[in-house]
Every structure is written in structure tokens, then in C-alpha cells.
Design a protein with these regions (language model features):
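Acyl-donor-binding surface of acyltransferase catalytic domains
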Residues: 1-7, 79-173, 309-315
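Short amphipathic alpha-helix that is part of the acyltransferase structural core
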Residues: 2-50, 169-204, 324-326
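C-terminal "cap" of GNAT-fold acetyltransferases
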Residues: 4, 156-177, 281-293, 302-326
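A conserved beta-strand-loop-helix scaffold within acyl/acetyltransferase catalytic domains
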Residues: 35-56, 76-84, 199-254
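Hydrophobic beta-strand residues of extracellular immunoglobulin-like
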Residues: 61-64, 224-227, 269
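Conserved hydrophobic beta-strand within the GNAT/NAT acetyltransferase core sheet
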Residues: 89, 129-131, 249, 283-287
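Conserved acetyl-CoA-binding loop-helix of GNAT-fold acetyltransferases
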Residues: 99-116, 254, 260-273, 277, ...
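Conserved active-site tyrosine of GNAT-family acetyltransferases
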Residues: 140-144, 299, 304
Length: 326
């Protein structure tokens, strides 16, 4: 890696350490607050959990920029999403320190890390890096354009304020059953992979990966999960949780044989009703605005509005054969 940065002498770049969990989480909250949407921030507990995922090491895959007195004002992490060929970067710059080369320095270091890691990819695979900016963050979007990134997608965070628990009706033959981790986890994992294979940027996860991300996260509550069954088959699911002070529809999916019957909307309304009964009247979710399965339509029909927009960028690091679910 190069030691060259775009920083002035009052700022320094270094690898992250485990001691940085709380200050990095504080930085992320500050940035999201300035962008007007703290629901997409994180807690120290969730950040630490993410850092413990297999294949990620904050001391090699995450970087911070700090002031001379040790205050962290910039953060970037790089994740190997699939096969050392699809990488994603996630970064934050304190609003008082924008325009000082922090974002460019961090993205440059993330790219260098990706270039080193891609040596483990199959030699004919296309290698690319994804990153995103808040739709209101013109500085960040200009930085990505300057670094050679192209806009490839838009994502929305949608939200609804509930004034009552909506009614819902499941399609004939479909019923909810409580989620039993021992009996149902493998089946929900398989249904999750199947339901999202057509989604942009998606790929199958292993059961270990899925369990870590879904069942072992700090705020996991099995009583919030809605699993729709048709006999012995899972037809759809809504993996709900509480997130940063609101109800969150984390992953809502319907398997292809059960699509077009209103199950997606029923799952959404059932999720709203459950949150409302628990005293939570604000519910949000994230969705690909260009989703080919029409995922945004039931959300809009249910009365959800766009609360935030995020611009997804891509940079090709090496041409080649596309990944199976790219």
C-alpha cells in the first residue's frame, strides 16, 4: 500500500483497532444525523458484531482518519461480498471536515485493499467495487465521479407513520407459524436465498453467514419474525426487528410460486400491525428503487413514503466473467 494521502498535516490515516468501535459508531451517527436520517446509523454493539463476521478484520479491512488529538473524523470499511471479486466499501466523513481530502484518502486506501485481496479471486472473474452516497451528499457523489465510479443503482429507505394497526388477509391456504430456530432456521435460510436470487447484487449465502447476520445480531427477536407457510412449504417471510428507535422490516420476501397472490402486501401489513401492537408507530425498510420483482409497489400501496435516497456507485477493477448472481 502507498503512504500517499490527500490529507493536510493536521490529519492522519491509520488502520482501525477494536478500541475504535465506540468512536466510529459515534461518527456514523453524527454523519447520518447531518444527512437527516439517523435510522440508518448503527450502535456500537451492532458495529462490533459486524466487525466479527468471518473474513473481515477491522485491523486490515477498516481505516480511520483522525485529528492530531486523536478524534476520529473519517471511517471506511471494505467487505469481500463474494469470491474476492465483488467488494463493497462503506465510509463516513464528519460534516465539519468535508472537503479536506478525507473521503478520497479513505476510498483510495479501500481500493488498494481490494486490489490486494482480488489476487485470491479466480483469474477470469470480473472484479468490481460498490459504494454508496446519500442522495443529498453532493460532495460524496462528486468524489466518486472523480475517482472513476459510475452510478449503477438507487436505493430508498421508505417509512410509514401508523395511526392504527392495519387489517390484513393472508391468501387462501397460507398461515403464520411462530419461528422456531431449531426447526425452521434452515428452511428460512433456503427460502431467503431463493426469494432474492433475482435481486440486483444478490448471491446465495451459506447457512453460517446467514445465521451470523440474521440470528446472532444483537437485536434479533424471533417473536418479530413472520413466517408464512403453505402446508410444509415456506411461502414468504418478513424478518422484522427494531432498529435505531423504529420498527424495521429487515428482509421481506416471497418465493416465486406464491407471488402475485397478495402475500407480500399481507406480510407488510401484518408487520405493521405487529409493530403497532408493540407500541411502535414508525416503521421503515430499505429497497432497491429499480427492483425487477416490483418490490417497491406494495410498499407504496401500503402508504409508505420515500424518507431517504442513496446512490450506489460501481468501479470495475478488472474485466472478466460475471459472477453468477451479479
Amino acid at each position: 500500500m502507498t503512504d500517499k494521502t490527500h490529507l493536510d498535516s493536521s490529519l492522519g490515516l491509520r488502520a482501525a483497532t477494536w478500541a475504535d468501535v465506540h468512536p466510529v459508531a459515534d461518527l456514523i451517527y453524527t454523519v447520518c444525523e447531518a444527512d437527516g436520517d439517523v435510522t440508518v446509523a448503527t450502535t456500537p454493539e451492532n458495529l462490533e458484531h459486524a466487525w466479527r463476521e468471518d473474513g473481515f478484520d477491522p485491523e486490515t479491512d477498516a481505516f480511520v482518519v483522525q485529528t492530531a488529538d486523536g478524534r476520529i473524523v473519517g471511517y471506511e470499511e471494505l467487505a469481500n461480498e463474494q469470491a474476492f471479486a465483488h467488494f463493497s466499501a462503506d465510509g463516513y466523513v464528519h460534516p465539519d471536515f468535508k472537503g479536506r481530502g478525507i473521503g478520497t484518502t479513505l476510498m483510495t486506501r479501500a481500493e488498494e485493499r481490494a486490489l490486494a485481496m482480488m489476487k485470491q479471486a479466480e483469474p477470469d472473474l470480473r472484479v468490481y467495487l460498490h459504494a454508496a452516497a446519500d442522495g443529498k451528499d453532493e460532495t460524496g457523489q462528486e468524489m466518486f465521479a472523480h475517482l472513476g465510479y459510475q452510478i449503477v443503482r438507487y436505493f430508498w429507505r421508505m417509512e410509514i407513520q401508523l395511526d392504527s394497526a392495519p387489517a390484513f388477509a393472508l391468501p387462501t391456504g397460507i398461515e403464520f407459524r411462530p419461528f422456531d430456530r431449531d426447526a425452521h432456521a434452515q428452511l428460512v435460510w433456503q427460502a431467503d436465498n431463493e426469494a432474492f436470487r433475482e435481486h440486483w447484487g444478490s448471491h446465495d449465502t451459506t447457512f453460517k453467514e446467514w445465521s451470523f447476520r440474521k440470528l446472532e445480531r444483537p437485536e434479533f427477536d424471533p417473536s418479530l419474525w413472520l413466517i408464512a407457510w403453505d402446508g410444509s412449504e415456506i411461502a414468504g417471510f418478513s424478518q422484522n426487528r427494531f432498529r435505531m428507535g423504529i420498527g424495521w422490516v429487515g428482509t421481506l420476501g416471497v418465493r416465486k410460486p406464491w407471488r402475485g397472490r397478495g402475500l407480500g402486501l399481507a406480510l407488510l401489513h401484518a408487520s405493521f400491525a405487529d409493530f403497532y401492537r408493540r407500541g411502535m408507530k414508525t416503521v421503515g425498510l430499505g429497497v432497491d428503487a429499480s427492483n425487477t420483482t416490483g418490490a417497491t409497489r406494495p410498499y407504496q400501496r401500503a402508504g409508505m413514503r420515500i424518507a431517504s435516497e442513496f446512490v450506489n456507485f460501481e468501479k470495475e477493477l478488472r474485466p472478466g466473467r460475471s459472477l453468477e448472481y451479479e
